[in-house]
Amino acid sequence: MTATVTTAPATTGTVAKALQQALVDLTDLHLQAKQAHWNIKGEGFRSLHLFLDEIVDSAREAADEVAERLAALGGAPDGRAATVAATSGLNALEGGALAVADVYAGFAERTARVAAGIKATLDAVDAEDHLTNDLLIGIASELEKQAWMLRASLA
């Protein structure tokens, strides 16, 4: 006889809410980072331009992992533009040309904010789903590393 392993549905509740919020925050982060990437001006342009692409790639990959985890648990990930705009925990990025120093500071705050939002859910998520908790810990750790690198660039 083969044992069947099932995963409890996460269409509502703590795990689903944590994953959905992480999804919209990570999606907003990668969209804002790409917008800044196109519009930064000033000394240090090239290194920040390249680093923003790293943030874009990392946040996009993390958002995909989060969405796929939510779907695997029976949820329906919602990464639509309207949902991201309405529920993201990030402040909007201003339009137009952006000064390099302001973008370093702004994205240090943004990456730290997304990490903090994820970390705030970890105890509750861990009580229900260790695997999701592990996924979120890895994402938060990477975001904290990026925030540190951005802050260090301002020193």
Question: Where in the sequence are the language-model features?
Answer:
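Metal- and O2-centered redox machinery and metal/ROS homeostasis
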Residues: 1-22, 57, 113-114, 145, ...
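Charge-rich, acidic-biased intrinsically disordered regions
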Residues: 2, 7-10, 46-47, 51-54, ...
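Helix-loop segments that flank and shape redox-cofactor active sites
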Residues: 7-14, 29-54, 119-131
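Phosphate-binding glycine-rich loops and adjacent basic patches that engage nucleotide phosphates
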Residues: 13-32, 66-84, 99-113, 155
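Alpha-helical scaffold segments that form or flank carboxylate-/histidine-based iron centers
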Residues: 14-22, 41-61, 100-107, 130-144
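A structural signal for well-ordered alpha-helices, especially hydrophobic packing surfaces
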Residues: 23, 30, 37, 56, ...
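Conserved alpha-helical segments that form or flank metal/cofactor-binding pockets of metalloenzymes
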Residues: 41, 47-83, 153
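Acidic/histidine-rich alpha-helical segments that form the ligand environment
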Residues: 64, 68-69, 82-138
